[in-house]
Amino acid sequence: MTKNNIFTPGENCWVSSEARYVTPLIDCANYYKALHNAISKAQHSIFIVGWDIDSRIRLLRGKDEENAEAPSVVSDLLAWKAEQNPDIKIYLLRWDSSLAFFAQREMWAKEVWEEKTPDNVETQLDDTIPMGGSQHQKIIVVDDELVFSGGMDISTNRWDTRDHPVQSEERQGPDGEYPPLHDVQMVSSGPVVKDFATLVRWRWERVADSEPIALREEADTGLTAAKPRTWPDDFPPEFENVSCALARTIPFMDEVEPAQEVRTMLLDLINQA
């Protein structure tokens, strides 16, 4: 490992990769707006993996919500997309949670999603995580050509704007107004999308009886590819041809090799600082 090549697959990452385009989405208002636009354009498949996927969440607020052609509430949006295009496949994989988090999350999530969406939307709760652990990968892959990844879930008490006002009429959760919240997601295209698409399918296959839709081989994820059709309109690429890697934490589970890639990556980055 050198300063010019910090990524070492099998040690501090699962795979090293490249992103054709990358844009950071700072704070949830920007992330949800970009996500809404990308979902509205989807034609092939949508994979949503998260700590939570709450059907009640409004992705848009204010004038964006008033002027949108597609529904703002995420369950309505996915139902609209699934009905608009019966051939699209949508997969929702949420952590099954523990009793400690029941008050923070939507009750009977799998049944709620199944009631609110048509049959081409499939929902699973991941209960393979050992007791005491949780599922913290927050990944959305759209048409196998675009990926959102980072720290934000589609969950209650997440939405906020960049200015973080002390009080906000729009910053309301099930229990009323909540305090400002800062977080970051990013949207990427290029070869890294195929890596994320492989990862989310592996996650799905571990808990579901059905196999997910095959990877869309015609998706242009090369380093010379044009901006994908599903790229969110109001968020132009900020970086091009970025070296990156996927680092995971995998606990001891049946028939799965554990991994401490995130820990190792952080230590390697600190050592090279």
Q: Which sequence ranges carry the predicted segments?
A:
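Charged, low-complexity intrinsically disordered terminal segments
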Residues: 1-273
